[in-house]
């Protein structure tokens, strides 16, 4: 059954005589029900203030699918005593993807976007992640794996966005910083292996369950984190726009990005770098709610912060970040672009949950690992914690297949995932440049604004830090300041 029917696509967006309900009618239990009763044996007790996920009580059948995937695949539920702690959530949305009754959903923020577009004092900017053009066609009867970037750009302009940018631009920026950081770590033999840090669900998982390993995370912001920072600084300066009047909207396949954009570590000059995140689902809902055809108008991205390499587009698929990083790391270390075998790096492509390879860069053998889902990541984390890990660089994504299988995407069965992977690989192979360091806009932004990877400006706007969040596992009552009895 397709996801529109399975998750009651229209019903969950337009409720009660067509009036739009922002955020849905998520489950709002009492404190007693949420933390202390055995009802959580039948469903995940999602808290009302969860920024990414909502639960619709009336639709829940108690099938336990949400618990099963959270416990067995993402290794969250069951790693703490649900009867005595917060409901711990990494916002990956696996529970949404596995709920067959539409009882779990992303928190809706698309009406906030409509409100911003309708405000004449605001400049509303959309940034499109690479998995969105590879997935949205499923909602409109277009074959899976069709890459529809120009369709989405035109549709966003019909919705009223002032600018439509390519988040792949900042994927290239991420690789410039991450490859530089990897080279420094290899040379200094410090905090190895290096973990990728562009998946916020994966980052939060480490912060909660493996806080002693947070120093292994790359300090580079995610592409969306960098995109927002550059929109509010570099883009605003070049366009002569007051950044306080900008509403930056990330359109992504990911529910965890709704959480990520709230992290204080990603603020830019006292402002949120990204003001709103909506999923592929929500973009489709917006278009349908305003009777806008997806493919009625085809236009390219705005060219300023709208140009990306093929490597940047690979961020949407498992192994893509690793492939892109290896290409630029090879150039940084040897001064030459990599040979064909490293350009493709087929050993880390595909839908196996854990893949490994050894790559030769300038006479140095670099061992890399790529995985998705926390059950696979946990194997590597335990190796790192015990000192037995043989890898130098590890990429982790929370969702099956990477971002293309995100919880905000249409149905992600094997056929759809493979079609989307093929689409992104094709876009990469046909790109004008396949190397982040050759993107002319990336060259310009370093010349005009950043300076070089690892510079003071880079550290301020393109890097972040991580914190120990293991306190979330402590009993809820120990964290509450109860008023003394009178």
Name these PLM-found stretches.
Residues 29, 34-46, 52-90, 94-112:
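Iron-sulfur cluster-binding cysteine motifs and their immediate structural context
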Residues 14, 26, 51-52:
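Intrinsic disorder/low-complexity detector
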Residues 21-31:
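Hydrophobic membrane-targeting signal helices
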Residues 18, 22-23, 330:
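Charged, amphipathic alpha-helical interaction segments
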Residues 13, 57, 197:
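Conserved residues at beta->alpha junctions
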């Amino acid at each position: 059954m397709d996801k529109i029917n399975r998750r009651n696509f229209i019903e969950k967006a337009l409720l009660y005589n067509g009036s739009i309900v922002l955020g849905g009618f998520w489950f709002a239990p009492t404190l007693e029900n949420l933390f202390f009763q055995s009802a959580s044996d039948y469903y995940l007790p999602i808290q009302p203030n969860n920024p990414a996920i909502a639960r619709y009580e009336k639709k829940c059948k108690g099938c336990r699918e949400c618990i099963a995937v959270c416990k067995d695949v993402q290794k969250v539920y069951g790693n703490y005593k649900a009867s005595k702690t917060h409901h711990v959530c990494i916002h990956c949305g696996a529970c949404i993807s596995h709920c067959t009754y539409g009882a779990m959903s992303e928190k809706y923020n698309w009406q906030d976007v409509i409100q911003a577009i309708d405000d004449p004092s605001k400049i509303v900017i959309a940034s499109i992640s690479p998995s969105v053009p590879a997935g949205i066609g499923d909602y409109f009867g277009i074959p899976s794996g069709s890459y529809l970037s120009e369709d989405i750009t035109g549709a966003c302009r019909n919705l009223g966005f002032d600018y439509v940018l390519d988040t792949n631009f900042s994927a290239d920026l991420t690789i410039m910083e991450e490859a530089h950081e990897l080279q420094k770590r290899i040379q200094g033999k410090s905090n190895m292996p290096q973990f990728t840090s562009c998946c916020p669900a994966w980052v939060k998982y480490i912060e909660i369950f493996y806080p002693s390993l947070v120093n292994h995370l790359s300090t580079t912001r995610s592409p969306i984190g960098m995109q927002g920072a550059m929109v509010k600084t570099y883009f605003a300066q070049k366009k002569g726009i007051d950044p306080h009047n900008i509403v930056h909207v990330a359109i992504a396949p990911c529910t965890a990005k709704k959480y990520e954009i709230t992290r204080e570590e990603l603020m830019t000059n006292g402002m949120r770098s990204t003001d709103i995140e909506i999923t592929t689902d929500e973009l489709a809902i917006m278009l349908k709610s305003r009777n806008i055809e997806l493919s009625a108008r085809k236009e390219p991205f705005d060219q300023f912060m709208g140009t990306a390499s093929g490597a940047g587009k690979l961020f949407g698929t498992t192994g893509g970040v690793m492939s892109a990083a290896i290409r630029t790391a090879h150039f940084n270390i040897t001064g030459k672009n990599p040979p064909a075998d490293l350009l493709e790096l087929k050993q880390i492509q595909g839908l196996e949950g854990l893949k490994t390879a050894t790559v030769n860069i300038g006479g140095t053998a670099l061992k890399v690992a790529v995985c998705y889902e926390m059950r696979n990541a946990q194997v590597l984390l335990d190796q790192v914690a015990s000192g037995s890990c043989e890898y130098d660089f590890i990429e982790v994504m929370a969702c099956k297949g990477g971002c293309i299988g995100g919880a905000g995407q249409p149905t992600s069965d094997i056929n759809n995932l493979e079609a989307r992977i093929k689409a992104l690989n094709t876009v990469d192979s046909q790109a004008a440049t396949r190397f982040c360091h050759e993107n002319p806009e990336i060259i310009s932004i370093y010349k005009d604004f950043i300076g070089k990877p690892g510079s003071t400006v880079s550290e301020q706007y393109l890097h972040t830090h991580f914190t120990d969040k293991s306190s979330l596992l402590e009993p809820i009552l120990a964290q509450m300041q109860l008023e003394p009895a009178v």
